[in-house]
Amino acid sequence: MLKIIIPTTMLLPMTWMSKHNMIWINATVHSLLISLISLSLLNQLGENSLNFSLTFFSDSLSAPLLVLTTWLLPLMLMASQSHLSKETTTRKKLYITMLILLQLFLIMTFTATELILFYILFEATLVPTLIIITRWGNQTERLNAGLYFLFYTLAGSLPLLVALVYIQNTTGSLNFLIIHYWSHPLSNSWSNIFMWLACIMAFMVKMPLYGLHLWLPKAHVEAPIAGSMVLAAVLLKLGGYGMMRITTILNPLTNYMAYPFLMLSMWGMIMTSSICLRQTDLKSLIAYSSVSHMALVIVAIMIQTPWSFMGATALMIAHGLTSSMLFCLANTNYERVHSRTMILARGLQTLLPLMATWWLMASLTNLALPPSINLIGELFIITASFSWSNITIILMGMNMMITALYSLYMLITTQRGKYTHHINNIKASFTRENALMALHILPLLLLTLNPKMILGPLY
């Protein structure tokens, strides 16, 4: 694990020592090299004693998420260049420092062995994200968004700390690898139910569960491009990862407690998809679509079968790349039209034909077109939920239909029709932007050839 953590740490002095015209090149190239090194972790053997240590370990669940995290840093740096072009050199370096720190915390969170260490790093990711949103966001509402983000996440994760201390006192260990061998099934007593809720709530807020999701659209809409990308692609996956790790420890209570959350997630999935159909703000639409996709992941994790876990992992990776790409595309529109309202930025296909191609590909992967990994993840989840209860197929089918509807609504509103008069003289798309979109879509296309790399715990 140190072969990734140490080079990432060394990005910090490198950024501050770079000359002002070399900052972006240095940071992007070196972070890309780190992400290429991390690809070796995807080749997980069955008995991988190589990747275990007392502090950090990686298995087939954390490796795909870890690679996604490292892959995203160069993409965030590429996307942010235009947004920061008017800032001073020191501020650019500070911004890059925040992104690198965030990546460092995320890598360590995904690979921590001790639950308390996991909790500390889980909370540490909050600080750089908050600074990125409240310092570099576009509108003044960013302060309000930062406040929502901070208090939802903090209030959700405080009970987790108490529950972890309680588990430590009863079992004597908080190590992920050891605690599984503590074969003491939890009874349905009130104290255990409260402990279960305390453990799960932090991750439910982070996912977010429908009803606890109000911070997400605000934070997404007000964050700068890199903030939106990392929030959608990796920070939401922390919730899913934490739930997968902790629900297996709390069995068989999870099976008993899962029903209300399953119903709420399925209902929320339909609701947030329907909200997407009425959005005028492009970033807000993509944010709500994230909530509906993550509701599917919550359903999968709560069902607790091997198939559903595989589906959850696949959908998390697929959604990370897809939503990040959609935010990049929304940002390219915003930089040209200076508005997030979809009606003001319509008919762009005639002006930016190559961007329209990227829009089409992103929308199609978002609505889970075969053979994309989004579809593979959704099929696993739908199969698992159907075998859990036949009635769920109605809700799942409705969700897939509404997802297709809002994806096409987004595509048609932004790309088709006659363009408005105030966007006659917009700039053509840059090579940087096209490379950025290609680096998002290529992993998605390549993973369709070998999806078992990201199917998580079973492979």
From Swiss-Prot:
Its keywords, alphabetically, are: Electron transport, Membrane, Mitochondrion, Mitochondrion inner membrane, NAD, Respiratory chain, Translocase, Transmembrane, Transmembrane helix, Transport, Ubiquinone
Enumerate the catalysed reactions: a ubiquinone + NADH + 5 H(+)(in) = a ubiquinol + NAD(+) + 4 H(+)(out)
Residue ranges annotated as transmembrane are: 22-42, 60-80, 98-118, 147-167, 193-213, 224-244, 257-277, 284-303, 308-330, 351-371, 391-413, 435-455
Give the bilayer topology. Multi-pass membrane protein
**UniProt EC number:** 7.1.1.2
Q: What is its main location?
A: mitochondrion
Tell me a Gene Ontology molecular-function term this record carries. NADH dehydrogenase (ubiquinone) activity
Superkingdom of origin: Eukaryota
| A Pfam entry, by short name | Oxidored_q5_N
One GO cellular component term noted in the UniProt record for this chain:
mitochondrial inner membrane
User: A GO term (biological process) for this protein?
Assistant: mitochondrial electron transport, NADH to ubiquinone
Q: What class of enzyme is it?
A: translocase
Cell compartments where the protein resides: Mitochondrion inner membrane
| InterPro entries listed in its UniProt record | NADH4_N (IPR000260), NADH_Q_OxRdtase_chainM/4 (IPR010227), NADH_UbQ_OxRdtase (IPR003918), ND/Mrp_TM (IPR001750)
**Briefly, what is this protein's role?**
Core subunit of the mitochondrial membrane respiratory chain NADH dehydrogenase (Complex I) which catalyzes electron transfer from NADH through the respiratory chain, using ubiquinone as an electron acceptor. Essential for the catalytic activity and assembly of complex I.
Family, similarity comment: Belongs to the complex I subunit 4 family.
Assembly, in brief, is: Core subunit of respiratory chain NADH dehydrogenase (Complex I) which is composed of 45 different subunits.
Give the protein's recorded name. Answer: NADH-ubiquinone oxidoreductase chain 4
Species of provenance: Sus scrofa (Pig)
